[in-house]
């Protein structure tokens, strides 16, 4: 008796028992969600050389201990305008702020950077126990920790400071960092000891290469390199993106400024914007917004005409001929529309300008790239999940006609879902999927034809005047 798998709508010629795994497969096969951007920042607080996942203001407050309005987080704010999740990587750590809070007792910021200078330690006598003291830590005048102790050695570290030394907290010491300091002043209910000496450290090229090395093991859709200078560093960045895309099959895009990458994986930002609060977002800083917007865009969404939230002008207003010329060079531009005072993306393109039979001008459009990348990433994910599922049940995908049919069914279901969502068109499983056994008969050779749906960006009207 014959057996195997079957596809709904296709009758078998032979009698037999056939199993259709369609229901289970449909539960697994899905379109992946986009929205994650990897972003290096030179912030003034937080753990350095590690990624922190930020999806909300609450995440930022809890995981980093900073307000979203902190001046050092401009790039994060711009990226988060469109990205769902920002994998924030603090590039460097400067000197840690500190202060003596009693004779022989010191409080030291847990992280280096100028933000540590905004920490204040206040020591008050406990209202219920005259022999105890309330030691309160403040960041930006907001209470972040409070401990009641009798001796300094009882103090424990919190998320903002560590305490070292032993001594009597009622000692008389100078109040460092506060206005009106005197050589000696008794700690009282209004005393505030401000930490000082915290400094930032400017990142260098090696800090950015450390960022790229760390990012290689993370999962993201788009990654930004927000640097103004350094062609060698940008070339390293482009090589990193090419290695991920072409060597490892991880279809991501990279965004940098003023670098003609001539590659569909690199977006070249060459213009900046002016925010409503007067902040100038230069092209290198604008990479954060472009990366966030590109990550947040779905596979069937173009950024062409998308407005830059909070922008009131561009840094350089370009005439028509200049815009056309620079688009031809693969530059990502912003345009100011004087009619409604808005700033928007001129055209959602990447840096690819050399077209071939294998990569025509369609590959210069980021929307098309997002569709093709979705096919690659989603099918890779689904096949891995399928292999894992079969391994978990004590079997493998058979290198046989049955396994071939099962893989084709999974691909068909995914492509149909993608077409229903408007990402592709004209898909025909009979014509567009060809699967055969490889020469060693331990795998499959799969040919897949895909027709991505482009965005309507040009509208032509023939107007007849009667």
Swiss-Prot record:
<comment type="similarity">
    <text>Belongs to the myoviridae tail sheath protein family.</text>
</comment>
<dbReference type="InterPro" id="IPR020287">
    <property type="entry name" value="Tail_sheath_C"/>
</dbReference>
<dbReference type="Pfam" id="PF04984">
    <property type="entry name" value="Phage_sheath_1"/>
</dbReference>
<dbReference type="Pfam" id="PF17481">
    <property type="entry name" value="Phage_sheath_domII"/>
</dbReference>
<dbReference type="InterPro" id="IPR035089">
    <property type="entry name" value="Phage_sheath_subtilisin"/>
</dbReference>
<dbReference type="InterPro" id="IPR035326">
    <property type="entry name" value="Phage_sheath-like_beta"/>
</dbReference>
<dbReference type="InterPro" id="IPR054564">
    <property type="entry name" value="Gp18_domIII_N"/>
</dbReference>
<dbReference type="Pfam" id="PF22671">
    <property type="entry name" value="Gp18_domIII_N"/>
</dbReference>
<dbReference type="Pfam" id="PF17482">
    <property type="entry name" value="Phage_sheath_1C"/>
</dbReference>
<protein>
    <recommendedName>
        <fullName>Phage-like element PBSX protein XkdK</fullName>
    </recommendedName>
</protein>
């Amino acid at each position: 008796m014959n057996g195997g798998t079957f596809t709904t709508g296709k009758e078998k010629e032979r009698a037999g028992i056939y199993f259709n795994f369609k229901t289970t497969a449909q539960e697994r096969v899905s379109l992946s969600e986009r929205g994650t951007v990897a972003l290096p920042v030179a912030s003034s607080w937080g753990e350095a050389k590690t990624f922190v996942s930020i999806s909300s203001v609450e995440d930022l407050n809890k995981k980093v201990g900073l307000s979203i309005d902190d001046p050092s987080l401009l790039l994060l704010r711009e990226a988060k305008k469109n990205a769902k999740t920002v994998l924030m990587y603090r590039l460097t750590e400067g000197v840690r702020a500190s202060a003596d809070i009693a004779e022989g007792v010191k409080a030291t910021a847990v992280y280096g950077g100028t933000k540590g200078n905004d920490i204040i330690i206040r020591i008050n006598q406990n209202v219920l126990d005259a022999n105890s003291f309330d030691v309160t830590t403040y960041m930006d005048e907001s209470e972040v920790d409070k401990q009641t102790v009798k001796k300094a050695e009882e103090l424990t570290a919190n998320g903002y400071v560590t305490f070292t030394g032993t001594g009597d907290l009622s000692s008389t010491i100078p109040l460092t960092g506060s206005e009106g300091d005197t050589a000696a002043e008794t700690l009282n209910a209004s005393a505030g000891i401000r930490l000082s000496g915290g400094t930032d450290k400017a990142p260098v090229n090696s800090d950015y290469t450390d960022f790229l090395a760390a990012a290689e093991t993370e999962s993201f859709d788009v990654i930004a390199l927000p640097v103004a200078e350094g062609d060698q560093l940008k070339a390293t960045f482009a090589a990193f993106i090419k290695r991920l895309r072409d060597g490892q099959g991880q279809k991501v895009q990279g965004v940098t400024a003023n670098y003609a990458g001539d590659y569909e994986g690199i977006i070249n930002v060459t213009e900046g914007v002016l925010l409503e609060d007067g902040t100038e977002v230069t092209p290198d800083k604008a990479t954060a917004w472009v990366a966030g917007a590109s990550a947040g865009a779905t596979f069937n969404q173009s950024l062409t005409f998308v407005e830059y939230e909070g922008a009131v002008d561009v840094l350089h207003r370009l005439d028509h001929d200049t815009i056309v010329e620079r688009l031809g060079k693969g530059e990502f531009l912003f345009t100011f529309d004087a009619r409604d005072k808005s700033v928007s993306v001129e055209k959602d393109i990447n840096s690819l300008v050399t077209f071939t039979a294998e990569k025509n001008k369609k590959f210069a459009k980021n929307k098309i790239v997002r569709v093709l990348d979705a096919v690659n990433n989603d099918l890779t994910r689904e096949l891995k999940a399928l292999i894992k599922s079969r391994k978990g049940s004590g079997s493998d995908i058979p290198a046989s006609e049955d396994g071939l049919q099962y893989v084709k069914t999974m691909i068909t279901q995914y492509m149909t879902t993608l077409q229903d969502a408007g990402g592709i068109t004209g898909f025909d499983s009979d014509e567009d999927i060809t699967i055969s056994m490889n020469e060693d008969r331990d795998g499959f050779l799969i040919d897949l034809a895909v027709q991505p749906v482009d965005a309507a960006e040009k509208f032509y009207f023939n107007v007849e005047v009667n």
